[in-house]
Amino acid sequence: MLSCWVLLLALLGGACALPAPLGYSQALAQAVDSYNQRPEVQNAFRLLSADPEPGPNVQLSSLHNLNFTIMETRCQARSGAQLDSCEFKEDGLVKDCAAPVVLQGGRAVLDVTCVDSMADPVRVKRFWPLVPVAINTVAAGINLYKAIRRK
């Protein structure tokens, strides 16, 4: 009888010692950290966006790829600083990354591949400054039409 209790406790203790499955947000953090450990990376990169965005309904096991965008920060890559406290570098590099999700024994094995982003994070021209130009052009056209019609 004692051996049954010992066996039961050993099984329960072993089950409790198993690592918790990796969540989507944790996998993204692990992928960014993996990229930052590369020898060619001087300044650390931080997560800019992910597709899909992290949320309670996103399960890592349902994804085939992690797709995310990272941006260069002002912190050194191997300084040990918390990435959340690092500010993005003005005109810093932006990279689009992908990592196939391979689950082995409840752990994710990530092979991160990043390329320079084609999206330019600098300011874009806005529509509103062009409105006065358009109004003046239309008004000049109307005045020209009226002048021609009078003749």
Swiss-Prot record:
Keywords: Antibiotic, Antimicrobial, Disulfide bond, Immunity, Innate immunity, Membrane, Secreted, Signal, Transmembrane, Transmembrane helix. Residues 1-17 form the signal peptide. The keyword Ion transport does not apply. GO terms for biological process: antimicrobial humoral immune response mediated by antimicrobial peptide; defense response to Gram-negative bacterium; defense response to Gram-positive bacterium; innate immune response. It is a single-pass membrane protein. The chain crosses the membrane at residues 128-148. Pfam families: Cathelicidins. Disulfide bonds join 75-86, 97-114. Its main location: secreted. SUPFAM superfamilies: Cystatin/monellin. The keyword Heme does not apply. It comes from the Eukaryota. GO terms for molecular function: lipopolysaccharide binding; membrane destabilizing activity. Detected in bone marrow, liver and lung. It is found in: Secreted; Membrane. Residues 18-122 form a propeptide. InterPro entries: Cathelicidin-like (IPR001894), Cystatin_sf (IPR046350). GO terms for cellular component: extracellular space; membrane. Belongs to the cathelicidin family. May bind bacterial lipopolysaccharide (LPS). May have antimicrobial activity and play a role in the innate immune response. This is Cathelicidin-3. It comes from Gallus gallus (Chicken).
